[in-house]
Each structure stands twice: as C-alpha cells, then as structure tokens.
Amino acid sequence: MASTGATPMMQQYLSIKEQHRDAILFYRMGDFYEMFFEDAQTAAPVLEIALTSRNKNDTDPIPMCGVPVKAADGYIGRLIENGFKVAVCEQTEDPAAAKGLVRRDVVRIVTPGMIIDNALLEKGTNNYVVCLAHADGVVGFASVDISTGTFRVCESSDLRAVRHELLRIAPREVVIPESGADDAALSPFVSLFPPAIRTTLANREFDYRTACQRLTDQFQTRSLEGFGCRGLKPGIVAAGALLSYVNDTQRQKASHLTGLEVYSIDQYLLMDEVTCRNLELVANLRNNGRQGTLIDVLDACVTAMGSRLLRRWMLYPLLSAEAINRRLDAVAEAKEGLGTRKAVRELLKQVYDIERLTSRAVMGRVTPRDLLALKQTLFALPGLATELKSFDSPFFSFAGEPGPEGLDKLAGLADLLKAAVREDAPVSIADGGVINPDYHPRLAELVTISRDGKSSLARLEATEKEKTGISTLKVRYNKVFGYYIEVPRSQVGAVPAHYVRKQTLVNGERYITDELKVFEEKALGAEEQRVRLEQELFADIVGRVTACSPMLFAVARVAAGIDVLCALAQVADDHDYVRPEMLSGGEIIIEEGRHPVVERMLSGERYVPNSITLNDTDRQLLIITGPNMAGKSTVLRKVALFSVMAQMGSFVPARRAAMGVVDRLFTRVGALDNLASGQSTFMVEMEETANIINNATPKSLVVIDEIGRGTSTYDGLSIAWAVAEALHDLHGRGVKTLFATHYHELTELENTRPRVKNFHIAVKEWNDTIIFLRKLVEGSTNRSYGIQVARLAGIPGPVIARAKKILLDIEQGTYSFEAKSGTAPGTGQSGPVQLSLFTPPEQMLVDRLQKVDISTMTPLEALNCLHELQQKAHAISETDG
C-alpha cells in the first residue's frame, strides 16, 4: 500500500490503516463504508459483494469495495463470524463545514468479544471476552461482557479447575500477554482456543500496580478491597489489562463497568467440559444446537435477561443447601401463586433487554427504537412491583434495589421518554423525525417552517405551471442538486428566459430560478436546523438515561431473577415436577423419576419412570446391566441432571426426590476419537476415567456409562473391574457411582464389596424378540440381547441367523472355523477349536489361584503361596521363551 502520489483522502486512509493493521478498516465516505487494497480483496468474497477498483484507468488501480452504512451491522457480523476484526472509521466533522479534507478517526473496534450491537448478539447467551495472567503458580482470569456490563474475576492454583472454568465460560475472545503463547504457565490454556479469537497485548499492560490504578480510577474508589479483592494478584492483573483493552477498542471509558464480581471456582458445583457436554446442558451432542438440551426444557423465560441468568444458574449450581433452599422457596411460592405468576409473566413480556439497552446507551450506541423499548419497559415496572407484593420471598421485590427512590427516578425517566420520543421514530437519528415537536419550542417552530415549506413548494409549482403553461412541470428535490424545476423535453421550448438550466436529462431538463433559490435557502436552513436540534436533544436524553444506568442495571438484575424463578415454577406446574428435599447427608433418593428431556421428546409413547437410591452405606456403587437401547444411559443421566437441577434451584420430574448436595459431578459417557490431537477412543476413555479417580471426593457423584470398550475384551473387563473397585474404595470412603456396563462379570463385585448393588434394566422376551420394559430393577442379568437389538436395528436375517449359531457355539465352549469347502483347515473335516483366554500352562496358574482361600490364610502362608505362584510363573515364562 504505497502512498506515493496518493490523493489527500487516500493518504488519510493509509495513515489510519497503518494504526489498525490487524483489522479490516471500514472507512466512512458519505453513506458508505469503503474498504481498499488488501482489506477489499479479503472482505469482498466473505461479504459476497462486488470487488471493484478506484481510479480504474491508472496503471495500478486500487482494489475497493463498500457497504451501505445503514446495513453495516450485518456485514460487520459476517466478518466477525469469519474470524476478522473490524475498525470502524467515521467522519468526525460535518462535511459541509469541513475546510478541505473531512476529518476522520476510528471510533470503535469490533472484535468477537467486543460486540454491543444487538443484531450481532445471541439474546440468551453472554458474549464474554476473557483475559489471562499468572504469577507464582496461580492463574488469574477476568471476564467481561460489554453488552451487559458484567465484569468477573477469579484465580486458582488448580490448573485443571482453571481449564474447566475457561471452557465453561466459553469466551468469544481471549486476551493474553504477547508472551502468552510461549509461556509454559499460560500456553496450555491459550491452546484451548483457536488463533482467530486470541488477542495479544504488550506485556507492559500486565503490571499489577498499573492494573490497580486503572481499576480504582474506573470504579472511582480508593482501593479494591470493597470488591473482595484482598490477596488477589494475577486476577487483578488480568482485570486491569482487560479493562485497558475494552476502553481502547471502544475509544472511550466503558463507564457501565462499575465494579468487580470476585468468585471462586469451588463456590459452585464443579462440572468439567466433558460432563457439561455429555449431559447436554446447553448444547446437544448431535450438532451443538439447543434442541434436546436441559436448557431447552427449562427455559420458559420471557425476557432475554432471564434466559441468560438461567443459563448461568445451570452452569453454576450452588453448593450451599441454605442458598439452594432460598431459591426453591421462591419457586414453590411462584408455583402456588398461579394467578400472580401469570400476571407477572405477562408484565415481564413488556420488559425489553434492559442490560443491553442500558449498555448501548452508556456507550453511545443506542437508537431511537431502543429508547421506545426502554420507555415501554419502565412503564411496566409499577404494575410489576404491585403484583410482586403478593409474594413473600425477597427475590420478588424491588425494595432492595433499586429501591423506592430509584423506582421514582425511573418513573420520571419514563415520563421524559414519553414526552420526547415519537412513537413512529425511525431507526436512526441521522435524519431527525425522532423527537416530538412539542418537546422543545424551537423544534416546534422549525417543524412548522418545514411543514409550511411543503405547502409553499406546492403553491410555487402551481404558480409556475400557470405562468408557463407547462402542465407537466414539476418542482422536486434531491440531496445532490437541491430544489429544481423539471420540464419534459417536449416542453423545453416553452421555458421562460429567466429559467437557468442546471442539468440535462435524456427525457428533459432541470432548471432553477431566483425565487426557487430563496425558497431553498429558507427550507433547507430550517430542515438542517431541525435535524441538528433533534440530534442535540437526543444526545441530552441519552445522557439522562446514562445517569440512571445504576438503577436500570439494578432493575435488570431483579427482573432477570424474577423471570427465572417464575419460569422454573411454570415448567414445574406444567410438567408435574416436585420440590427436591435437600439433605444434610450424602443420600440421593429418587422415586419414580423421569428424564426431563427424554420425556418431553417422546411423541405418543408413555415414559416409564424409575426409582433409585444412592447412599454411603449399602448402595454407594450401583452396577447397572442390560441390553443396548434398554435405557441404561437415560437412567444414569437422569440422576446427574437431577443433581444439577436441584442445586440450581429447580424442581425435578419425580414423585419424590431427596438429594444430598454434590460437590463435583463427573461423567464418563461414550467417546469419540479425538483425531485432531491423535487420541483414540480408548485413550479418551482412559483420560476421562483418570480424571474421575484423581479428582472425585466422597461428596461427588460419578456416572460411568461403559468403560473399556476401546480395547480387547479381557483388557477392558480388567480395567472396568479395577476402576469399579477403586471408586468403591476411594479415600477409604468411596464415592457415589452409577456404573453401567456390558461386562456382566462385574456383578460379582456385589459379593466382594459391601456398598455395591446390582441393578438391571428389565426386558421381556416374546416370540424370539425382546420388549424393552425401561424399568430399573434390583439384581443382575447375564444376558445382553445383542442379537435381538441387531435385528431391531435392521441387520439382515441371514446375518442374524449366523450370529445366533456362532453365539450358541461360543456359549457351549466351542467354535468351528470352516474353510470355503466346508471343512476345517488342515483336517478334511470340521472340528471344534476351543476359544481360551489362557494357554494350558497359564491355566494351571489360574486354577491354583481360584483354589486359594485368602480369608483363612495367615500373612506368612499368603507370602509363601505368592512365592510359589511366582516361581511357577517364571518357569512358564522361561518355557515360552
């Protein structure tokens, strides 16, 4: 992009572009944003717009493309989705008043995490940017959603927990020091996210003192201790660097970030990304969509704020039984108060997304339509406050925040918006037509002049027609030529001498007159003044909204909570959910429980409920067997989902549920090859299992749906057996575990471990087929019904028949390998071949081991027996060698 011989405008462009080389520059020129050089070549195919060139006749024309200002948000969104940043460069002075080149500057930088425009955001999901820092083995991270004013900070020395938390936040952008990708402490976390959403800042931005100063200046406080930041260091560094990034990209102070929410990872039920994915809490396994997820079932919220808060409650279930019960009390009250709940939900439907509306107002991005939405919201508040008086729970009240005084101020703001903003206000303030004329006397005067001008224009046209005798004469206006008289070519001969030609057209001529010039100056002067005054009044109104932003954010917090609680009550009422009893111990008791998602997805089929009990005495580890498709996975996931639902404050689909608080929730459910990182199914299984064994506590809940399938049968059985024993014996107390398996041998654990119980999913055989009863019953089963399931899946009949023959031979201890001729290879006739895990000498060792009665042996006898077996093993090994 050489600037030699460039025009002043292009020199200005190149100068601005030089400062934003990592972004596509949207350069404002009139009603368009233009892109040039490499930016144009990159953006045109992504945006599916024409790539043209500036100065086409030059030997080296400049590639260019452009998009209309009015449609820019959509184009910016597409670039962001494709991994680009966009620097928006505006004309910062009135072109009509400019002396020479119009002054321009970048007013904001749009990145994946720095989005505030509603059209580019998902209404029910926060849009987080996260910043990472570390010191002395501790990783700190801060997260901001600039669209809602949320600012959170956390730090931990538990690196695995940090990983899980970052993935739970699911940021749209990650900010790191320039050395972060090569930093041994940060690189494992940086690598979790694709390069397209990583942003680097200079290392100097990650200075502790600088961070403290930035944050106290932002929050207008003397220290950060009031936010609970005592002892935090890398967390503060991350927060300070992130604040600098936010203010820099927005080219202003993000004044709606008024405080820090400090939290600890262990404040909430710990669920890693594997568990969240396997349980399909907020995204399904099929296509990462919302359908078929827990949030899809529970989200009956009527506001966007409520949907976001519900998602947060779901991903951050509580650990305090007292706090859980406070939420459950509120849900119970809303469930019982049907009439009030219905009225409250109807009023909440009139409440727009106050968080994002207010954020846009503070950041100067609010539109006239936003103000109308805010007005409607504010007028709904008094009625909402009145209805909420029927409830006793403090969750259902504005008394705490914003309080009576705050509500009064917001009522005044509502009256102001009603008086000021026209109901038919356009999307943009650019051309006026937003402010009610009666709101300001000078505006009313200018509107009258403009209105009278239109009448005068009509009279002038009629007069000219009469004077000239040209009945087809028209007086018109456009932004390029102003006012003009247009005469068809057939009537040009009748044009008076005092008409001055202004433009020649194919079908006629355009003229001006002295009288029309006088009218134009008067009319355009009034119109320009009206638009300018409206813009000034609009800015003043936005300033008043901004002044009320603390109260508006307070209303948003309360309204979101009310919406979530009423939504949970509505779901409970509609689908026969019950309040879970929160126990002080570790028991989990579910009577006739139903999977919340599966029961809603069944069409015309009756859901079969199941009861289950887990405790720390005799039912701590449940071995669950049964055929594929019988419903083992549904039972397992249901119990895990009940823990999530109860601890987030939701009722559960059951006849009765009593739940102890779970501190960590682990799932090992199925597996897919992670080919990108070279991991097989079996390796993924083992890593997930290792995570469970290494991190589960006696207060955790573990759900394992098959283990060991990715290796040989005997290896898999051995591993599954050992893992089950390890979970039973973990920390000397064990951990509550649901263990579904196809290895029926594991049912023997009930005889060797005191807290193991066998269960199976009942199946009924009928006419050589099976009927899934979907019922969990106590006891084991030794059949998998794999062939019957294969038939149901559509495997051809001959294959099924052959499988049944092979199964029968194997069950009888023989299997005949037949050559193509129908005879066994090398024998001339078919013959049995015994399938055995061990060779004969090894079998002798196995037989000897089976006869050993450890319970009757002294320690010395046991050692002697072990020595004997070891000697025999050495002998067998030498013989084989």
From Swiss-Prot:
GO terms for molecular function: ATP binding; ATP-dependent DNA damage sensor activity; damaged DNA binding; mismatched DNA binding. One of its GO terms (cellular component) is cytosol. PROSITE patterns: DNA_MISMATCH_REPAIR_2. ATP binds at G626, P627, N628, M629, A630, G631, K632, S633. One of its GO terms (biological process) is mismatch repair. Pfam families: MutS_I, MutS_II, MutS_III, MutS_IV, MutS_V. The keyword Cytoplasm does not apply. Keywords: ATP-binding, DNA damage, DNA repair, DNA-binding, Nucleotide-binding. The keyword Coiled coil does not apply. This protein is involved in the repair of mismatches in DNA. It is possible that it carries out the mismatch recognition step. This protein has a weak ATPase activity. Belongs to the DNA mismatch repair MutS family. This is DNA mismatch repair protein MutS. It comes from Desulfosudis oleivorans (strain DSM 6200 / JCM 39069 / Hxd3) (Desulfococcus oleovorans).
